[in-house]
Structures are given as C-alpha cells and as structure tokens.
Amino acid sequence: FRNKKGRKETFQADYRIKRRTRKTAYSSISLPDMINQDCYPFTFVHRSRNCGQGILYVDIYRFKSTKSNLTYLVRVERYEHNMYAVKFYQKNHRLSPKKYQILSHTYEARRIIYTCMNVMFSVYKENPRASFGFIGANCEGENEADTKRYRVYRKIVATQISEEQFIHTRNKEKSASTISNLL
C-alpha cells in the first residue's frame, strides 16, 4: 500500500515501527527490573468494586497473543494493606470454574508471564507501596503442592524482581508466593 506521502510500505514494516515505539515508551518508566522485551501490549478494560471476600476492587486488563491469536485477561485483585493478587486466563475460558488450570498449548508461557509482570509493574507505578501475590494453579491430575506453574512463576519472579526492594516469601505446600514491598 502507499502512505500519505505516496511512498510504498508494507504492513510488516509498519508493524515494526509501532513495536519499536512501544518498547521505547516502556523503557522510559523507571521501575525495578522493568521487563520491556518479549511481551505483548496490554490495555486496561474496567474496574469492579464491592467484590466481597476482602477484595477492595478488581482491575481487568486485556492483551492479545500475536502468535496464537488468543486473547488473555489479567485480573488484578486489590486487598487491604496494598496487597494485589495477579491472575490470568484465556478470555474464551472466562466462564469456566477451572479457567486458571486450563493449559493453552501455545508454547508461549514466558511471553505471557512477562506481559502479566508488565501489568504488575504498571500497578506498582500507580501505587509504589504495592505488594503482590500469586498462586501457581495445578493442572488436571497434579497435586496442589509445588506445581509446575508455581516453579515457573517463582523462577521468573526471582530473576526479574530485585530482593533489595521486595521480600520474596514462598509456600511450596500451597504453591503460593508473595513479593512484599519494603516501603
């Protein structure tokens, strides 16, 4: 196709320009160990209040995988004492009670987790006192202790989030981990 100046361009070249711009925008944010490579752009969808069970509000973010063309939702639950729980699942599984346990089989877990961590860092930018928690859900037939997902999340979090600003607490029996802010 031709652009406004009459120059010939391809969709691929246009995509690279947008992607480069997106990366530059992320790199200007000064957060601890900000991940700006190998992740998808995300958008804020909405905030729900009065969710019960000690949850003050829930923020929903959305991103789309360019590899598998699947849409994912990231659920960030805000609790008292600046505690946030970050969860994600495929949009087409949103009504399933096992939405956190279903595997996508797209082999892009790292990129999806990095995107969720960028959502987490955007929450941290809004609230510098934020602490985070996550649970690695068990797959069908897997024990709830020390799940495969938990081990992957724990490894990525340990390499990406500094222990100088956050205390890392792990519970293998529950496959749970918290990242407590030192502020």
Residue ranges, per PLM feature:
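Non-catalytic substrate-recognition and accessory regions of acyl/acetyltransferase enzymes
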Residues: 1-183
